Amino acid sequence: MKTYPVFQDAGLKVVFYLLQDADNIKKPYREIKEQIGVSLGSVKNVLDELARRGFVCDTKNGRIIKDKKQLLDLWVSNYNEVLKPKLLVGAMAFRTEANRNEWKNIALPKGMSWGGEPAANLTDGYLQPGIFDIYTEIPAAHLIRTGVVKQDANGEIHLYNKFWNWETDNRTVPAILIYADLMGSGNSRCLEAAQRILKNELKDFERKGVLLCYKFYTEWFLLCF
C-alpha cells in the first residue's frame, strides 16, 4: 500500500493546523480543509497516514494526537526543508540604520505578520533580530509604501507567503511557526531563543497523548475480558 507524503506541501499545512490546538484534530474534514486551503482528499489522506504512523489515536472522547513533540520536530524539519523555500517572495532592507533600530514602531500593513527573530523578540524580548521574517497575504509593495524599507535582494527582511487562513495575532505568526523559523536558522542564539519559545509558549507539547491512548486501550482491554 502506497503511503501518503505527509511531509510535503499539503501535508505540512494540514499538520501545522492540527498542532495549533488539541481540538483541531476532532473537527470535520471539511472545516479543516477550509482553514488551510487544501483538498478534502488531502485532509483525509494526511489523517489516515498519521494514524498509520501512530500519531493519531481514537479515544472515547474522539481523536487525539499523541507524541506531539515528535510530530512537531518532524514538522519543523520538513517545513524548513520543503515548504518554506517555496513560500519566499523576496528580500528587502531597511532604508536607514535608524529604521532598522526602530523596527518595533513599524505598523505592518494588515495582512502581514512578523515571524522568526522579530516575532521571538515581541514574544519575550530575549532575542535581538538580525534577520527579519515577515509572512504576508498581500503584495510586498504594501510594505514598501510604509517608507521604511526598500527592495534589496540581499536585504535582511525576508518576505514569505502566508499559508494558513485563520486569524492570528496581528503582529506575530503562531508560536509554532516562530519556533520553526528559529530552529531553521542554524544560528546558536536563535536555537536558544527557540528553546525559550518551546518552554514558555508551547508547554502542551508533552507526551500526554500517549498516556491518554494507553489509558483508553487499557480500559477497553479490561472491558473485553
Could you describe each region identified by the protein language model?
Residues 1-16:
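Short alpha-helical segments that sit at the start of domains
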Residues 15-73:
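Loop-centered beta-sheet repeat module
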Residues 68-84:
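Long, well-ordered mid-to-C-terminal structural blocks that present hydrophobic/aromatic surfaces
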Residues 80-216, 220-225:
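Long, low-complexity, charge-rich intrinsically disordered regions
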